[in-house]
């Protein structure tokens, strides 16, 4: 009888590092999970208004309109930055014998690449407007997928957002990216009848 048929795939240094760090995180950091639904109607309406205004301001330039278009994730990044400013303990990192509270909201965003997951950082999100967050998010995600991020563009960060909503995922649990203390896992929005 023939044995199982398979192919062993080599592991890149990046994947090896990701696996090591996340395994250590899960084994050494206390994880607890809070799940809740939020109403997105106003965010989606505001996004639609902003994107319509941006398209009109582009005067028929499709590329300019596309570059200015905001995603739902851009609003989530800005909301997280505001929340981190209001709750400094969530904007902190564990360093063994001390906890470092950050004064800026440097938000890492999880980006899937052919070599694994990487978390480029939008620095000082609390001081940025939605347009800047949207522009930087697109630029960093493209650089990540192209393998062109510089170390300072993905090392550090005070908080991570992992959004799988665009893939239709309704719920998942994310692993904290050490030494950060928190990660926000975002699922898909859905139409739902909500009683008054």
Report residues per predicted region:
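C-terminal catalytic/motor cores of large multi-domain enzyme assemblies
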Residues: 1-196
């Amino acid at each position: 009888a023939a044995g199982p048929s398979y192919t062993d795939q080599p592991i890149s240094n990046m994947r090896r590092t990701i696996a090591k760090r996340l395994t250590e995180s899960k084994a050494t950091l206390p994880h607890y999970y809070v799940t809740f639904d939020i109403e997105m109607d106003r965010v989606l309406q505001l996004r639609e208004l902003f994107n319509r205004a941006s398209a009109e301001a582009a005067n028929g330039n499709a590329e300019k309109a596309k570059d200015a278009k905001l995603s739902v994730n851009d609003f989530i990044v800005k909301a997280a930055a505001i929340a981190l400013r209001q709750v400094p303990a969530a904007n902190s990192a564990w360093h063994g014998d001390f906890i470092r509270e950050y004064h800026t909201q440097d938000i890492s965003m999880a980006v899937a690449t052919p070599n694994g997951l990487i978390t480029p950082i939008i620095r000082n999100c609390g001081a940025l407007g939605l347009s800047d967050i949207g522009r930087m998010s697109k630029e960093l995600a493209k650089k990540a997928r192209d393998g062109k991020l510089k170390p300072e563009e993905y090392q550090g960060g005070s908080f991570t957002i992992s959004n799988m909503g665009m893939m239709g995922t309704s719920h998942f649990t994310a692993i904290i990216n050490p030494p950060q203390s928190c990660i926000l896992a975002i699922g898909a929005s859905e139409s739902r009848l909500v009683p008054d």
